[in-house]
UniProtKB/Swiss-Prot annotation:
The protein's name: Small ribosomal subunit biogenesis GTPase RsgA
HAMAP family: GTPase_RsgA
Annotated gene: rsgA
Cofactor note: Binds 1 zinc ion per subunit.
Domain CP-type G as annotated: residue spans: 111-272
Residue ranges, annotated region (Disordered): 1-35
First-level EC class: hydrolase
Basic residues bias (residue ranges): 1-11
One GO BP: ribosomal small subunit biogenesis
Length: 349
């Protein structure tokens, strides 16, 4: 007999009980100031409830408590922490402060608004593939997210080894749409290793996120780039009915590439939606539209069949790609459909 799927309310209660257990466990470890070393810098490798794994400057990991005055702490945060003179109940230090973030990746939550899930990201690697079909709509969705978050994108088209010469020429022509907008595009194959060296160079010295739909080869790419033992963690599935799973599969985690650079990965990081955005944010997310904003005849122009629309006029002059224009309206339509089914409220600032 299959397990009964938990409702949203039941999942939230399971999560709340889990957090209370972690908080209770945390209260068992009380650090006296005399037991702590001098403050030092660190990076959050992963966060587990009231605890976090901190990487010290020497590369060693320390499971730490988190000061109750710290209200937001995610993977990638740069912190000040203090090591304990001894390990107590598996805890070897405490996080005392968080440095200001250069960037933060957020995910819309149906109940809690925008939730930060990773910090200090330099680029989002948008992984797409030519099979079962090349979806420009998905690429454009992620580009809108990148523009809204103000994080630089890198488009990686995987599985190009499956293309013949004619197919390759067609895909190159399609990708020229994005190159013309000054987006970086990389064609590669994790199977033949074509383009892997170029991708390694693009990742070196940066903190990256890999994003894309299931089946496009994200895990295969990461397996090709990371140490095998680390990469194996990335392909595990979450089987826990509560959706919490194990720490190694559900918590966002930072990995180091052997060639240099880092990646933050988790199932929640790889896929994130746009339904929480306002239409105006989506419009600005199409960077080629920006020069025409404010030039339409009507202030409430929907940039479709409205008379005097500057964006449609640019489309008709060939200054905007029809594929991008069509995807813009598809995104708005899908967002409107989702918002009729979900309720969303942004958190107070």
């Amino acid at each position: 007999m299959s397990k009964k799927k938990l409702s949203k309310g039941q999942q939230r209660r399971v999560s709340a009980n889990h957090q209370r257990r972690l908080k209770h466990a945390d209260s068992k470890v009380e650090w006296d100031d005399s037991q702590l070393s001098e403050p030092q810098e660190g990076v959050i490798i992963s966060r587990f409830g009231m605890h976090a794994d901190v990487e010290a400057p020497d590369g060693k990991l320390h499971r730490c408590n988190i000061r109750r005055t710290i209200h937001s702490l995610v993977t990638g945060d740069r912190v000040v922490w203090r090591a304990g003179n001894e390990t107590l109940a598996g805890i070897s230090g405490i996080v005392e402060a968080v440095h200001p973030r250069q960037s933060v990746l957020t995910r819309p939550d149906y109940y809690d608004g925008l939730k930060p899930i990773a910090a200090n990201i330099d680029q989002i690697v948008i992984v797409s593939a030519i099979l079962p079909e090349l979806s420009l709509n998905i690429i454009d969705r992620y580009l809108v997210a990148c523009e809204t978050l103000e994080i630089e994108p890198l488009i990686v088209l995987n599985k190009i080894d499956l293309l013949d010469d004619e197919g390759r020429a067609f895909v190159e022509e399609v990708m020229d749409i994005y190159r013309a907008l000054h987006y970086r595009v990389l064609m590669m194959s994790s199977h033949t290793q074509q383009g892997v060296a170029e991708l390694e160079a693009a990742l070196t010295g940066r903190v990256s996120i890999f994003a894309g739909q299931s089946g496009v080869g994200k895990s295969s790419l990461l397996n090709a780039l990371l140490y095998p033992d680390d990469a194996q963690i990335l392909v595990n599935d979450v089987s826990d009915a509560s959706g919490l799973g194990q720490h190694t599969t559900t918590a966002a985690r930072l990995y180091h590439f052997p060639h240099g650079g880092d990646v933050i990965d988790s199932p929640g990081v790889r896929e994130f939606g746009l339904w929480h955005l306002e239409p105006e944010q989506v419009t600005r997310g199409f960077i080629e539209f920006r020069d025409y904003l404010g030039s339409c005849k009507f202030r409430d122009c929907k940039h479709d069949t409205d008379p005097g629309c500057a964006i449609r006029a640019a489309l008709e002059r060939g200054e905007i790609a029809p594929e991008r224009f069509d995807n813009y309206h598809r995104i708005l339509e899908s967002m409107a459909q989702v918002k009729t089914r979900k309720s969303f409220s942004a958190p107070d600032n």
